[in-house]
Amino acid sequence: QAPKEVAVILVEGTITTGKSQGPGLFGGGQSAGSETIIEQLKAAKNEDSIKAVVLRVDSPGGSAFASDEIWRAVSEFQRSGKPVVVSMGGVAASGGYYVSANADAIYASSSTITGSIGVIGGKFSMEGLYDKLGIEYELYNRGRNAAMFSSSKPFDDVEYAAFDKLISDTYRQFTNKVAVGRAMEQEEVEQVARGRVWSGQDARDRKLVDEIGGFSDAVNRARVEAGIGPATRVELVMLENRGTTDGSLSRNSVRQIMQTLLPPTMQVRNRNSPLAAYEYWQRLQGERILAVMPYQLEVK
């Protein structure tokens, strides 16, 4: 009997629109591009040999729009009758939780940082800097709020009200999807939302996570959800098409996959330098609303 395949899709780093990118020159970390991940989910849906997906999420979030795009792609994949199981890494917060919310099951380690269900947004006003440097700036626009995000001036009252509504609507959309995906009442979600951060164990106690377990536990759960019997051989398939234009899939061995999915305590990170922080936020340039942890937790 031919083996059944369980696909592994990585959501690692800052969630952005467009293609995924590798680590920056100064250690700013890689990005999980919604376009890349959507392509991988579509490929997994269309391959008959693939019976389930394990979504490995290690991300503090990023673009709210990109997170919603990935959430929709996960839901579309599930409508094909194939399950999605999430395996959380060291951090799966804000947008990282958004993309996980509708999974058939969510696994986290007891020390995973997750939750942070909330959105932030705003803009930098350079008006004072321009005045100090003697720079004259003329703005031509058409329409009441056409220049709302111009850096040459702060929000006026009307623009602020419009942007505040946009933030509130996005937050409501986020919490609604958590409520549906986790079979929770809206009031229950509010008690754990509003940006609150939880450990994996605390998240399980609050129904944000199903089980405490590692990557192999998530794979076994995907096998069960897909109805693959214990006597059937299962092969893991790493869907990796970064840098390709044809969406081709590379199949890596279990050893290679496990090396990629080392526990957080065995991964080396370098995101503490100012240049790394600059790279991190540069990747979110142009995004108006963010589903991202607005700080970095460092355990010493």
Which ranges hold each PLM region?
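Intrinsically disordered, low-complexity segments enriched in small/flexible residues
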Residues: 1-45, 49, 56, 141-144, ...
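Acidic/histidine-enriched alpha-helical segments
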Residues: 57-62, 91-94, 117, 190, ...
